């Protein structure tokens, strides 16, 4: 089975627990296995389901109690430097570094990934075009709006042309226009790479997403095409994604 799944981005048998005062260790993820496909996937789950934890493990910002993450032939434990160079992560609480321009902020992301100064600068210029911020390249990044700063974060994830992008609640707190713009960017960048976007908001899931994965009770409860997930909703549902999600996590039909 694993030989068939080794190509691509694979979480394999991941277990992760957190210690909570007076409660001991509480399991967040339990022997979770998931093969994230090429294209844009919505990682859907209620608050506290472990979505941020799963993405953090995928970016090697957290290490699981057991299991591993692999990208094609690379193992996140044994080949961490090479693995990190091909995976980009935008945490939910993205903030611009004070004092840096937009271009400098994006180039800094490339430098952190091991790119040379010249390559980082060149990559930043190209990435800003992809997120439609080239006209603001020399503005202080900290002066941009929340939606614009999220796009700076996305450019930082794109600067080294990563094969996998892990975006944690990237549209949280944005107005409808900014959300729509961000989803349009996802369509443009997701054609030839793996993009995983976490969300708890079923209303956020549109045709910008090709796939849906539902994280519930420590494991992936659904993994498939968007249309297949919507088809699980009761007949006549006005909000099929929401209905399918609620039915899945409550066990109701």
PLM regions with names:
Residues 59:
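Helix-to-loop junction immediately C-terminal to a conserved catalytic motif
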Residues 99, 140-144:
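Conserved ABC ATPase signature
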Residues 2-11, 15-31, 80:
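A short, flexible loop at the N-terminus of ABC-type nucleotide-binding domains that lies
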Residues 67-75, 82-83:
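Conserved ABC transporter NBD signature motif
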Residues 165-169:
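Catalytic Walker B motif of ABC-type/P-loop ATPase nucleotide-binding domains
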């Amino acid at each position: 089975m694993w030989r068939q799944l080794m190509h691509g981005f694979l979480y394999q048998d991941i277990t992760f627990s957190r210690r909570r005062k007076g409660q001991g260790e509480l399991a967040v993820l339990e022997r979770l296995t998931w093969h994230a496909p090429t294209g844009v996937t919505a990682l859907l789950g209620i608050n506290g389901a472990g979505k941020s934890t799963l993405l953090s493990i995928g970016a090697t910002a957290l290490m699981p109690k057991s299991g591993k993450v692999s990208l094609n032939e690379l193992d996140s434990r044994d080949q961490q430097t090479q693995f990190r160079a091909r995976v980009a992560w935008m945490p939910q609480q993205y903030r611009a570094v004070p004092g840096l321009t937009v271009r400098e902020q994006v180039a800094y992301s490339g430098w952190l990934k091991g790119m040379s100064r010249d390559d980082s600068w060149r990559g930043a210029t190209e990435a800003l075009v992809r997120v439609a911020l080239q006209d603001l390249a020399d503005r202080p990044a900290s002066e941009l709006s929340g939606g614009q700063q999220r796009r700076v974060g996305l450019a930082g994830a794109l600067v080294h042309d990563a094969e996998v992008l892990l975006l944690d609640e990237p549209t949280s707190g944005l107005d409808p226009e900014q959300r729509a713009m961000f989803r349009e960017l996802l369509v443009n960048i997701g054609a030839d790479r793996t993009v995983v976007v976490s969300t708890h908001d079923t209303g956020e899931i549109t045709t910008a997403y090709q796939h849906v994965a539902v994280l519930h009770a420590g494991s992936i409860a659904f993994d498939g095409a968007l249309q297949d997930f919507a088809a699980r909703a009761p007949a006549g549902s006005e909000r099929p994604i929401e209905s399918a999600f609620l039915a899945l996590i409550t066990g109701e039909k």
